């Protein structure tokens, strides 16, 4: 699969976009910048995260295979 934003990851795993962003924030992969937009942290970049190339409002994206497994592991460790 390709790179996906929170909206498409949410669709793939059956969760809302807000839920995905919340989990990514809890995982330390993204933060809100001074303008209130999502931005990657160093940890997010270290696992291959990139900002989308949108001129309107770039968003964090990850390779689905990578982020899916990390989300499953995080959920099993922290959210049960």
List PLM regions with ranges:
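Positively charged, aromatic-accented nucleic-acid-binding surfaces
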Residues: 2-14, 21-80
